[in-house]
Amino acid sequence: MRRIKIATLCAAALLLAPFTVQAQKLPPDIAASKIVRAALNTGYAPLETRDPKTSEVVGFDIDLAAAMAKVLGVKIEYQDGSFEQMTPSLQSGRVDLIMSGFYDIPRRRPFFDFIDYLRAGGQFYTLKSNADIKVATDLCGQTVTTGRGTSYPDSIKKWSDKNCVEAGKPPIIVITQTDFAQSLSVIQQGRAAAGVSGLEAMPSTIERDNNGYRALGEPISFTLMGMAFTKDDPTLRDAFAYALKQVIADGRYATLIKKWRLDFCSYTEVSINQGPAP
């Protein structure tokens, strides 16, 4: 009986071995260099920001990428730039992936493949001192700021068309900024009544400037956040999908979700290209 059990276990190991090796296979250049270059847009806590004391990049995305890199035996090297620069950086081959608050949405999928790893969506926020803005429809006819190159301008327009225009109210005026800090500055200066950012950023947004902000209404969109890879790089995509599964299975993903207060964004299905249009 013992020999039968051993034989069964050996057969199972042989069946699993090709999958494991294949799952961790890396493109030849990365296998040789042990370096994966990732596009990054800092200033979007809690996903990626710079520690004010050390200037080091920290955040959920940084920790999760490091955990996956450890599984694959590689090192992540970041190229920090504006949000709208990330897409051309990946398309031109200057980086190997994007993992920086990047939504998996249909209009991006003709160019990229996504590994989904967080629930996400858009949320209005404003200053606590904006007493005349009590509900989201108070933004009809007012200016709202958000990130350039994101899906939020489209989400705001859809929401405005349904909740403002159809109700006979003037539409929301959308302006865009190159990064989150600029959006906050525009609101503080009174050039915009509110902003739209991700659900994942709301806890840290509300705490900024001595808890000077508040979320406004319900989320205006829902989708999934993903790591983006070029369509011609399925080997690297599959390697990171394997690594993410391992990090979820061993509990490190849950630990990082708790550390960065992203419980409402947890997503453990490791799906490919499944984000709905926000």
Predicted features along the sequence, with ranges:
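Alpha-to-beta junction loops
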Residues: 36-37, 74-75, 92-100, 142-143, ...
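Short helix-initiation/N-cap motifs at beta->coil->alpha
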Residues: 62, 77-88, 132, 170-185, ...
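Acidic, polar ligand-binding/catalytic clefts
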Residues: 66, 70, 75-138, 276-277
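Ligand-binding cleft/hinge of the Venus flytrap
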Residues: 66-72, 152-176, 206-210
